[in-house]
A protein has these predicted regions:
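Catalytic cores and adjacent flexible loops of soluble metabolic enzymes
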Residues: 1-172
Length: 172
């Protein structure tokens, strides 16, 4: 059974969440038989140092293979939070194509870290995911077009602009 500490770094109702509180919830879900613990920044207020502190608490109770990260990009910290998580050994993350998503009970919260940004980071670190970045960028452009919005992925937007600049000009 998978469980999550959904507001491990900040709560829209109580504000900041301490590492002690995260560990208390992690212990409780472990006691009821949850075998995978997601550490989530659902409203996107986490920073790398605080993410590492929360993860270190979860990793006291679960092996690294049973802990995952879920980071929204409200304040532009999601990719830094993924990197900070990698530094403590995490290797499982939730991400969303084109950075889609949000949080209905947290005004202004954006979607999860964009899959394209995570793939670019991992590739830059020499980590082979077996996932085609170009394919994900194409998928993000398609779904964003259907939704009538621009992708929020910095990587996706940069690669789309690079492709457009490299395309031969149309003759008139």
């Amino acid at each position: 059974m998978r469980g999550a500490v959904s507001v491990a770094l900040g709560c829209p109702y109580q504000g900041e969440v301490s590492a002690d509180e995260v560990e208390r919830v992690v212990r409780l879900i472990k006691e009821i038989g949850v075998d995978h613990c997601g550490v989530c920044d659902t409203i996107g207020v986490g920073t790398p140092k605080r993410v590492q502190a929360a993860l270190e608490r979860a990793l006291k109770h679960y092996p690294v293979a049973e802990v995952s990260g879920h980071f929204h990009d409200t304040y532009g910290q999601a990719i830094g939070n993924v990197y900070a998580s990698l530094e403590v050994g995490l290797f499982t993350f939730d991400a969303s194509v084109a950075g889609l998503g949000g949080c209905p009970y947290a005004k202004g919260a954006t979607g999860n870290v964009a899959t394209e940004d995570v793939l670019f980071l991992l590739d830059g670190l020499g980590i082979d995911t077996g996932v085609s970045l170009d394919g994900v960028v194409d998928t993000a452009a398609f779904i964003s077009g259907v939704l009538g919005r621009k992708p929020v992925s910095r990587t996706g937007n940069a690669l789309i602009a690079k492709r457009a600049a490299a395309a031969p000009a149309a003759c008139s």
